[in-house]
Amino acid sequence: MSVMLQSLNNIRTLRAMAREFSIDVLEEMLEKFRVVTKERREEEEQQQRELAERQEKISTWLELMKADGINPEELLGNSSAAAPRAGKKRQPRPAKYKFTDVNGETKTWTGQGRTPKPIAQALAEGKSLDDFLI
């Protein structure tokens, strides 16, 4: 809670602050507080009415669906017939580059992920990636 709200919520602090203002100013502040409080109450009541209307509409639709033999779960796609299938496993990418590692073994690289050290070293020495194309 902010310092201002703590001050407004403490009766002793309010009394001390009220000594600095005239009665007319205090009456004006009181009227403003009443207006703000009334507006806030009306907002809360409006939200409650809207929520009640929404709940009533939902219950009406549920009753209509049950009368027609429709299960609400079917609409959400939770039925076994509408269950999404697991995605197919992706085919591995074909190798795009061929290089020889430090052990003299010939290896391939798809071009994705981290660049192999032998290729990175060759690129640093000025070679082109096209030199390693299969």
Curated annotation (Swiss-Prot):
Top-rank lineage group of the source organism: Bacteria
Q: Where in the cell is it found?
A: Cytoplasm, Nucleoid
**Chain spans, region Disordered:** 73-94
Q: Does the keyword DNA-binding apply?
A: yes
Q: Which NCBIfam families match?
A: PRK10328.1 (NF007656)
| Source organism of the structure | Escherichia coli (strain K12)
Q: Which family, according to UniProt?
A: Belongs to the histone-like protein H-NS family.
Tell me the function of this protein: A DNA-binding protein that acts in a fashion similar to H-NS protein upon overexpression, represses a number of genes including the cryptic blg operon, hns, papB and the proU locus. A subset of H-NS/StpA-regulated genes also require Hha for repression; Hha and Cnu (YdgT) increases the number of genes DNA bound by H-NS/StpA and may also modulate the oligomerization of the H-NS/StpA-complex. Repression can be inhibited by dominant-negative mutants of StpA or H-NS. (Microbial infection) Originally isolated as a suppressor of a splicing defect of the thymidylate synthase (td) gene from bacteriophage T4. Acts as an RNA chaperone, accelerating splicing of viral pre-mRNA. Binds preferentially to unstructured over structured RNA; does not have a detectable high-affinity RNA-binding site in the pre-mRNA. There do not seem to be any specific RNA targets in transcribed E.coli DNA.
Q: Does the keyword Nucleus apply?
A: no
Note on domains (UniProt): Both the N-terminus (residues 1-76) and the C-terminus (residues 90-134) have RNA chaperone activity for splicing of td, a bacteriophage T4 pre-mRNA.
GO molecular function ontology, one term from the record? DNA binding
Q: What induces it?
A: Expressed at low levels at 37 degrees Celsius, barely detectable at 26 degrees Celsius; expression is repressed by hns and partially activated by lrp.
Q: What is its main location?
A: cytoplasm
Keyword annotations for this protein, in alphabetical order, are:
Chaperone, Cytoplasm, DNA-binding, RNA-binding, Transcription, Transcription regulation
Known outcome of mutating G126V: Higher RNA chaperone activity than wild-type, decreased ability to bind structured RNA
**Residue ranges for the DNA-binding region feature of this UniProt entry:** 112-117
**Protein name from the UniProt record:** DNA-binding protein StpA
> Which PANTHER family does the UniProt record give?
DNA-BINDING PROTEIN STPA (PTHR38097:SF2), PTHR38097
Q: What is the documented disruption phenotype for this protein? A: No visible phenotype in rich medium; double hns-stpA mutants grow slower and have reduced viable cell counts compared to single hns mutants in MC1029 and MC4100 backgrounds. In 0.3M NaCl a double hns-stpA deletion up-regulates 583 and down-regulates 86 genes, 363 of which are thought to have been horizontally acquired; 131 are also up-regulated in a double cnu-hha deletion.
The record's subunit annotation is:
When overexpressed forms homodimers, can interact with the N-terminus (residues 1-64) of H-NS. May interact with Hha and/or Cnu.
Give GO cellular component annotations, separated by semicolons.
cytosol; nucleoid; protein-DNA complex
